[in-house]
Design a protein with these regions (language model features):
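Class I Rossmann-like S-adenosyl-L-methionine
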Residues: 1-213
Length: 213
């Protein structure tokens, strides 16, 4: 719950206040439990990475956007959708934790709306994504101007180039064995929906299957 609320607040700072993610994320990570810091990073980076696609999905489900003081709840919905589309967090947990975060953000009156939007997406995800993905820049997560330039320069390979550009290099992290065993750390990451495996390069080495950032 707190992790989703912090993710929405970080995204608001980046999009509405023009702050850099690298500048605001560390302070937010200090406000959540150590075991949730990697998840917070994944939610922030991932939501911003796929912002146009997530925004398009919201626009398919809502007639009127959330504005002004309610804008933070738009970002919370984006965080919820990111979990449903791009992570292996169980859908029921992703929805419940995101909806519960509404209370922390002091928007209890919007709880029903946010719950409805996320559950609507659960029911109709295939149709919604099929509709918005007709626009290549949305489907492939690139700005429209860059998509046009790539299509003009690489007539037959532009989609392959954009798909390759979305791939992230492997990310390795080091477990602090003085605090917990590597197996315990892997178990905590699995509970948070972060897929990782033990690395062969060292006793404390962990490889993230879905890098953050």
């Amino acid at each position: 719950m707190k992790t989703r609320a912090q993710a929405a607040l970080v995204i608001q700072q980046v999009l509405d206040q023009g702050q850099s993610l690298s500048a605001v994320l560390p302070a937010a990570q200090e406000k959540v439990a150590p075991r949730d810091r990697a998840l917070l990073q994944e939610l922030c980076y991932g939501t911003l990475r796929w912002l146009p696609r997530l925004d398009a999905a919201v626009n398919e489900m809502m007639d009127k956007p959330l504005k002004n003081k309610s804008r933070i709840f738009h970002y919370l919905i984006l965080v919820g959708l990111y979990q449903l589309i791009y992570t292996r967090i169980p859908a029921h947990a992703a929805v419940a934790e995101t909806v519960n975060a509404v209370k922390l953000l002091k928007g209890t009156s919007l709880r029903g709306l946010i719950n409805g939007v996320l559950r609507n997406f659960q029911r109709s995800a295939e149709v919604i994504l099929l509709r918005i993905d007709r626009v290549p820049s949305i489907r492939l997560g690139h700005p429209e101007w860059l998509t046009k330039r790539l299509r003009q320069a690489y007539h037959d390979e532009w989609e392959f180039i954009m798909e390759a550009n979305n791939q992230r290099p492997p990310m390795w992290i080091r477990n602090n064995s003085q605090r917990q065993s590597r197996d315990a750390m892997l178990a905590r990451m699995a509970e948070a929906g972060i897929n990782a495996v033990a690395g062969e390069e060292g006793e404390d080495c962990i490889l993230l299957e879905r890098p953050c950032g």
